[in-house]
C-alpha cells in the first residue's frame, strides 16, 4: 500500500486530534489515532496494528487501510473517500456516514442505509432498528448484526450474520464456513454449504444443500421452543435438524431431516419455558434419496407425509421402555417409498394414523425375542398394497412375506401373510 506520509506512528502510543485540529499524511502502523468531535484526519494510511478511530462529530477523509489495519467510525462521525485493501477492517453502525471502495466494489453508509460493505478481519456493521443494509459481504471474522432489515448478504468462510428479535433478513447466501444465527425473521435463505441456527425466530423458503446444516431451536446450549420454519427445502448433501419448534411444509430431495425427541430435562441444554416441543405440520414430501428421521414423542398429528420411491421415513421408538410402543401420525402416503418403525424390545407395536394409503413397504426393526401374529396393528383408515418386513436390530430379515390387511370396519389393519 503506497503512501506519501509525513507523520509516522509506529510506537504503539495514542494520539488525539482535537476540535479544530487537522492532521494529514499519517502512516499508522501501530497505536491509535483518535479524531475527536471537530477534528479532522486526512490521507491516513492504516496497517499492521494501527487503529484509526473517528469519534462522533469527527471527520476522516481519504483514509487507506489494509493488512490488519482497522478503521472505526462512531455514530455521527464521517469518513469519506475510503480505500479498503486486503486484510483491512472497518467497524461502524448505520448511524455513521462513510463511502469508499474495496477490491469487490464501492460501498457507502448514509442516513441509515448501508450498501456494498466488505466486512472481514473483525470488521462489523450494526444495522439499527428502522435501518437497512444490503449487498454486504462477510468474510473471515466479519460480522453483520441486524436489528433492522438486510438483504442480499453473502456470508463466506469465517463470516457471521446475526439477526436479532425484530430484525429481518431476505435473499441471503451462506457459503462454506459461514454462519447465520437467527432470532428474528428470514426468508429465501440459501445455505450452500454453511450453517444456520434458528434460535426461536421464523424463517421461510430456506434451501439447504451441498453439505450445509440447518438447525431449528438450538444454539448447542439452549433449546428455543418458539422457533418455526416454513417451506423448507433440503437437497442433496443438505441436513436439517429440528431440536425444538415447528417445521411446516418441507420438500426433501436427496437430503436428510431429523426431528429429535422432545425433552423437558436434557442435562445438555437449558430449556426455554421448561419445555421443548417438536412439531411437524403441513405437507412433507420425501423424494428419491431423501430420508426423514423422527424421534419418539414429536407431534405429527397435523402432518401429511408422502414418501416417494427411493425415499425413507423413519419413526424411532427405540428409547421407549416396556412391552408396547405406539407411533401416532397424521397422514402417510406411500408412493413406492419405505416407512421404518424402530423399536426396542417391545412385543406389541401400534401405528395410529388418520390415513395410510398407497403402495410401499413398512419395515419394522425390533429386538423382541418373539413375534406374535398381533405383533403390529394399525389404527386408522388404510388403503392400498402395503407390504410388511420385520427385521432384527442389525436389520437382518426375520419375516418379509407379510402385508397389512384392512379391517372390515375400515378403521384399522392387521398383519397377514402376503
UniProtKB/Swiss-Prot annotation:
Disulphide bridges, residue numbers: none
SUPFAM superfamilies (alphabetical): Pectin lyase-like
Gene3D superfamilies tied to this protein: 2.160.20.20
Stored InterPro entries: AIDA, Autotransporter_pectin_lyase_C, Pectin_lyase_fold/virulence, Pertactin_central
Name of this protein: Uncharacterized protein YdhQ
Organism name: Escherichia coli O157:H7
Amino acid at each position: 500500500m503506497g503512501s506519501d506520509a509525513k507523520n509516522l506512528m509506529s510506537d504503539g502510543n495514542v494520539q488525539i486530534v482535537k476540535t479544530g485540529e487537522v492532521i494529514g499524511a499519517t502512516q499508522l502502523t501501530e497505536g491509535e489515532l483518535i479524531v475527536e468531535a471537530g477534528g479532522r484526519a486526512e490521507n491516513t494510511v492504516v496497517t499492521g496494528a494501527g487503529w484509526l478511530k473517528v469519534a462522533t462529530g469527527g471527520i476522516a477523509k481519504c483514509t487507506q487501510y489494509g493488512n490488519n489495519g482497522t478503521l472505526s467510525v462512531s455514530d455521527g462521525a464521517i469518513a469519506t473517500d475510503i480505500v479498503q485493501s486486503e486484510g483491512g477492517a472497518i467497524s461502524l453502525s448505520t448511524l455513521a456516514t462513510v463511502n469508499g471502495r474495496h477490491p469487490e466494489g464501492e460501498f457507502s453508509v448514509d442516513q441509515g442505509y448501508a450498501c456494498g460493505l466488505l466486512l472481514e478481519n473483525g470488521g462489523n456493521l450494526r444495522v439499527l432498528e428502522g435501518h437497512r443494509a444490503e449487498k454486504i459481504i462477510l468474510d473471515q471474522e466479519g460480522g453483520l448484526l441486524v436489528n433492522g432489515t438486510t438483504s442480499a448478504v453473502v456470508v463466506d468462510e469465517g463470516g457471521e450474520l446475526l439477526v436479532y428479535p425484530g430484525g429481518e433478513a431476505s435473499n441471503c447466501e451462506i457459503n462454506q464456513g459461514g454462519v447465520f444465527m437467527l432470532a428474528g425473521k428470514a426468508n429465501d435463505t440459501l445455505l450452500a454449504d454453511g450453517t444456520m441456527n434458528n434460535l426461536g425466530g421464523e424463517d421461510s423458503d430456506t434451501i439447504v444443500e451441498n453439505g450445509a446444516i440447518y438447525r431449528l431451536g438450538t444454539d448447542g446450549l439452549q433449546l428455543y421452543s418458539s422457533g418455526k420454519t416454513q417451506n423448507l427445502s433440503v437437497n442433496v448433501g443438505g441436513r436439517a435438524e429440528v431440536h425444538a419448534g415447528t417445521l411446516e411444509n418441507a420438500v426433501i430431495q436427496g437430503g436428510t431431516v431429523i426431528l429429535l425427541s422432545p425433552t423437558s430435562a436434557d442435562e445438555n441444554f437449558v430449556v426455554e419455558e421448561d419445555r421443548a416441543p417438536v412439531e411437524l405440520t403441513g405437507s412433507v414430501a420425501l423424494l428419491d434419496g431423501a430420508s426423514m428421521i423422527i424421534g419418539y414423542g414429536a407431534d405429527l398429528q397435523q402432518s401429511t407425509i408422502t414418501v416417494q420411491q427411493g425415499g425413507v421415513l423413519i419413526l424411532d421408538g427405540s428409547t421407549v421402555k416396556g412391552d408396547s410402543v405406539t407411533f401416532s401420525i397424521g397422514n402417510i402416503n406411500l408412493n413406492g417409498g419405505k416407512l421404518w418403525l424402530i423399536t426396542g424390545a417391545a412385543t406389541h407395536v401400534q401405528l395410529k394414523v388418520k390415513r395410510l394409503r398407497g403402495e410401499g413397504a413398512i419395515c419394522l426393526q425390533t429386538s423382541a425375542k418373539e413375534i406374535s401374529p398381533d405383533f403390529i396393528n394399525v389404527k386408522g383408515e388404510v388403503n392400498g398394497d402395503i407390504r410388511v418386513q420385520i427385521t432384527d436390530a442389525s436389520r437382518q430379515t426375520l419375516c418379509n412375506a407379510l402385508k397389512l390387511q384392512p379391517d372390515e370396519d375400515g378403521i384399522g389393519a392387521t398383519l397377514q401373510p402376503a
